[in-house]
Amino acid sequence: MGQKVNPTGFRLGIIKDWTSRWYDDGPVIAEKIKQDQVIRNYISARLKKEKAGVSKVVIERTTKHIKINIYAARPGAVVGRKGEEINNLSQELTRITGREVKIDVIEVIKPEIEAQLIGENIAYQLENRVSFRRAMKQAIQQAMRAGAEGIRIRCAGRLGGVEIARSEQYKEGKIPLHTLRANVDYASVTAHTIAGAIGIKVWVYKGEVLVQRLDAIEEEEMKKMQERRNDSRGRGRGDGRGAKRRRRPAAKKA
């Protein structure tokens, strides 16, 4: 099942969190979900021109305002000179949503292992007539150098402009899709070339998330068990057989 399902959706609530964090009742839910998609599309389209490298947009809603966290490889391109770009973006989103919008920009430390940015980079190269094999292999090498434990890239469509569509993939390292504690980043991007649309899927394995937490829990349980054993030995039995014996005072020499 792990081979077929979306790796991000498969791990939601376990090691991954939702990108829309709010709760509501009634028919307004569908309207707000649609509005979230409009916000994401607008941000990605606007910041794509600035080459900010947006990997993720997290939306949080309160009763008074909307808070948006933008994860970008180049936060300076989002903020702009003296904060001009981010202020304009906030005002435009306030006009679209009808509510006050607050924007925070979070820097992506390693863009080479972000699946969304890898897919967008390959799509950009394919649209500029770069060989798909070269683009895929180069992305894999950069990701493995940056610290990824495994990566797989699949391209499907009229690769190289041929008449018959096909799919090709390259892989390095391991991608444990069935392991829920494995932090697998996934993205799907479309490249619009002269020959037609080419689908790009990227899986990046960044290591296990819960191993340290499980080890800490195990260690804590062992400590508690040892403390219980020590307490039970110290208390002893009710008849005094388990209690510690007192030493008799040494006899004084005459």
UniProtKB/Swiss-Prot annotation:
SMART domains: KH (SM00322)
Molecular function terms from GO: mRNA binding; rRNA binding; structural constituent of ribosome
Pfam family, one: KH_2
Annotated Basic and acidic residues bias: 221-242
KH type-2 domain location: 39-109
Keywords assigned: Ribonucleoprotein, Ribosomal protein, RNA-binding, rRNA-binding
Segments of this protein annotated with the region Disordered: 220-254
Keyword Cell membrane appears in the UniProt entry: no
Recorded GO CC terms: cytosolic small ribosomal subunit
Role summary: Binds the lower part of the 30S subunit head. Binds mRNA in the 70S ribosome, positioning it for translation.
UniProt cross-references to NCBIfam families, sorted A to Z: rpsC_bact (TIGR01009)
Subunit structure: Part of the 30S ribosomal subunit. Forms a tight complex with proteins S10 and S14.
Family: Belongs to the universal ribosomal protein uS3 family.
The protein's name in its UniProt record: Small ribosomal subunit protein uS3
Organism the protein comes from: Chlorobaculum parvum (strain DSM 263 / NCIMB 8327) (Chlorobium vibrioforme subsp. thiosulfatophilum)
